[in-house]
Amino acid sequence: MPKARVFLAWSGPRSKAVATALRKWLPHVIQTIEPWMSENDIEKGARWLTEISGQLQNVKMGIICLTPENLLEPWINFEAGALSKINDSIVCTYLHGLETTDVSDPLAQFHGTKADKEDTKRLIHTLNSRLEGESLETTRLDEAFEKWWKDLETDLSNAKGTHAQEPPKR
């Protein structure tokens, strides 16, 4: 059975670090999930817009990595909107350095997940419940989460120091 793909949306250095951390971590916790991230999963020479559009049409789960720096980025809103138009899809905003009250519409319409242990665990349970016959039993899922949480927590902590660089002056 093919793995369930999860689209990881990001924009900016800190958001990219969060998405990268999730891409590495998710398959350890739920082995039947295959995260997809543009930075890593588009081959050199491929048409990136075509690749992203194809992924957005064929996934049922997406995680939008939000940070204070990218809340108003058009691409984040585009990807969230594209994911939300798919029948039976879920769009999970993952808030790094943000509170749910920091997020405005249209992204506020999605029930946000804070990048902390308790809320991330709830997100994992949501993703697992969407795996249609491939989900892990709750005890096994909780054990895997506890085993791998420290790795994600470390990577999320390291992402806090990642900020956008000033654009070069002409």
Task: Kindly give the residue locations of the regions a language model identified.
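Conserved N-terminal substructure of TIR/SEFIR domains
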Residues: 1-62, 84-89, 170
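C-terminal interaction surface of TIR/SEFIR-family domains
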Residues: 1-27, 97-170
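Conserved TIR/SEFIR loop-to-helix hotspot centered on a Trp-containing motif
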Residues: 2, 68-86
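Arginine/glycine-rich "motif VI" loop of SF2 helicases in the C-terminal RecA-like domain
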Residues: 28, 81-91, 96, 102-103
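Short beta-alpha junction loops
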Residues: 41, 68-69, 94-100
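Generic structural "secondary-structure junction" signal
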Residues: 44, 73, 78-80, 105, ...
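Short, well-ordered beta-strand core segments
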Residues: 62-63, 112
